[in-house]
């Protein structure tokens, strides 16, 4: 049986509490971030430093996962803080970030570890509002670029999994918008995207997604 976990390695992130023999060592985490005021003050260079630290620790977490037999891992969506405000090419540490991401990707490929991600609920391709869709396309593109830097397969095996968003009073029209806006995504996202059903009756069931999304554009559920 293969097992895994999502995003936060409690033992490495909080060694004083959960670390056992790792007690006293520096936390290893991909959750470093900053508030907007800090970003506005310190700018993209500081974001680059945080992204590099997160990428370095992602590589270490992958090592730990392999050593401890974890074959599934959902990575954080926040490797680069405030990523909506800049491009990868703007980061002064990009080459090093790419190096650590590629290193992590080679390891998961060698050891058969499945990497996925689950972008946040603000990714709403069903939205009738253009600025919401634009932001969604940008955020999903960032995830696709991250997976490409890790050299992960462009297949649902390395899925970018999302809920499709609001129903806006008309599920059918909303799913039509989703399918239309799907075409705006780059191939790095299209080839990996999967959709997940909701647990509320007013939202999208597996049946809704099968007929309204999968049958139209073939996205796995």
Where are these regions (language model features)?
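Alpha/beta catalytic barrel-like cores
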Residues: 1-114, 123-137, 144-152, 156, ...
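Glycine-rich phosphate-binding "P-loop"
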Residues: 158-174
